[in-house]
Amino acid sequence: MHELIKYQFNTRRKKYGTGAALSLLNGNVGHEVLAFHKKLPNYAVTPLHNLAHLSQRLGLGSIHIKDESWRFGLNAFKGLGGSYAVGKYLADKLQCDINSLSFAALNTPEIKEKIKDCVFVTATDGNHGRGVAWAAEQLGLKAVVYMPKGSSLIRAENIRHHGAECTITDLNYDDAVRLAHRMAQTKGWVLLQDTAWTGYEEIPTWIMQGYMTLAVEAYEQLAETNSPLPTHLILQAGVGSFAGSVMGYFVEKMQENIPNIIVVEPHQANCLYQSAVMDDGQPHCVTGDMATIMAGLACGEPNIISWPIIRDNTSCFISADDCLAAKGMRISAAPRPGTDTPFISGESGAIGVGLLYELMNNMHYQDLANRLQLDASAHVLLISTEGDTSPDIYEDIVWNGRSA
């Protein structure tokens, strides 16, 4: 039988204060990052939707979902990491404090002369590359982006729209990253990659810190509306940079009251799940084309910076079928009339909704839901990381029933 959900409970979860250090993801860092983003063009707090009807229907205390389709006009959260990493890199280059730096200051003639030769290069399925291209565009700098085989032509065009050079390669994601790395070394470009390996850790750390803005906003939005803090946090993962960033912030913020953290990946690219199954404490890779509709999660090699955070704080690792992402997209787009706010959630953004719905509706997974303590006392926080970044694929799934 083909399982829609495979799971592995984490035997290595640590009590607060005994696991991987989180000093680079604490509240003070989060507020510094947020202050930087507030100075960027088009900054606005993204919505936090209260899915009250869905939570009642599923027998849960509450469901809130952060809608990152509104971020910087980029239709995804990734611009947070790319822009902050660009800011940190240029602050170091100019020997100034990022807290006193803004993109407006970087656009003065004196500073533009000092940074004019910077070229940023990265690999992406779309969202991260668009964020890097957008950040470079704000400063009149060049970006070069490599995309894996099978990438959406529309996503590539969106990257080129920001003035970047963009190539769809014949490589899978991890090999496209290696290509970007080689080109940076050969041409003296600046590699802005959202994953890390031995010897390349500083910039990926900055990117992870950049993602903290959405976590800080979500925490503050819950507080402002007198909503309960999450008992459950469901985070989707590719290499794990986003998941590590958001869980790191919430663990540091909530300390002994750490939520039940569930990390979900596509079956075809479930490197964190496989690492948990191996249960030796080390990150493990998956290889191949990793064909999944969740293109933003089609990554086979864990980020070595985020892995210890994920290993020490995740409650359960879940590997999910593509049909759950498709179901989440449809549920988000078409709630019952007059109930929850409809919103556009793309393939990688909607997996949390689809997973939660399946866990609470399919009797086959009732024991798993019980073990995860998903009941009337559960308050679940989800992040919709993207909107319809490839509108043709979105329409095919939501209207035509692809991956049903």
From Swiss-Prot:
Record field: catalytic activity: (S)-2,3-diaminopropanoate + H2O + H(+) = pyruvate + 2 NH4(+); (R)-2,3-diaminopropanoate + H2O + H(+) = pyruvate + 2 NH4(+)
Activity regulation comment: Competitively inhibited by L- and D-alanine.
Ranges in coiled-coil conformation: none
Highest taxon listed in the record's lineage: Bacteria
EC number(s) given by UniProt: 4.3.1.15
Cofactor comment text: Binds 1 pyridoxal phosphate per subunit.
pH dependence: Optimum pH is 8.0.
SUPFAM superfamilies the UniProt entry points to: Tryptophan synthase beta subunit-like PLP-dependent enzymes
InterPro entries referenced in this protein's UniProt entry, alphabetically: DiNH2opropionate_NH3_lyase, DiNH2propionate_NH3-lyase_sub, TrpB-like_PALP, TrpB-like_PALP_sf
Molecular function via GO: diaminopropionate ammonia-lyase activity; pyridoxal phosphate binding
Keyword list, A-Z: Lyase, Pyridoxal phosphate
Any Pfam family matching the protein: PALP
Reported consequences of knocking out the gene: No growth on minimal medium plus DL-DAP; growth can be restored by a mix of 8 amino acids (Arg, Asn, Cys, Glu, Ile, Leu, Met and Thr).
Lyase recorded as keyword: yes
Residues found modified as N6-(pyridoxal phosphate)lysine: 78
Cofactor(s) it depends on: pyridoxal 5'-phosphate
Induction (UniProt): By DL-DAP (at protein level).
Keyword Transferase in record: no
Family: Belongs to the diaminopropionate ammonia-lyase family.
Chain's role: Catalyzes the alpha,beta-elimination reaction of both L- and D-alpha,beta-diaminopropionate (DAP) to form pyruvate and ammonia. In vitro L- and D-isomers of serine are also degraded, though slowly; it is the only serine dehydratase which can eliminate an amino group at the beta-carbon position. In vivo L-, D- and a mixure of DL-DAP allow growth. DL-DAP is toxic in the absence of this enzyme, it may inhibit enzymes involved in the synthesis of pyruvate and aspartate, as well as amino acids derived from them.
Subunit-structure text: Homodimer.
Name of the protein in its database record: Diaminopropionate ammonia-lyase
Organism classification: Bacteria, Pseudomonadati, Pseudomonadota, Gammaproteobacteria, Enterobacterales
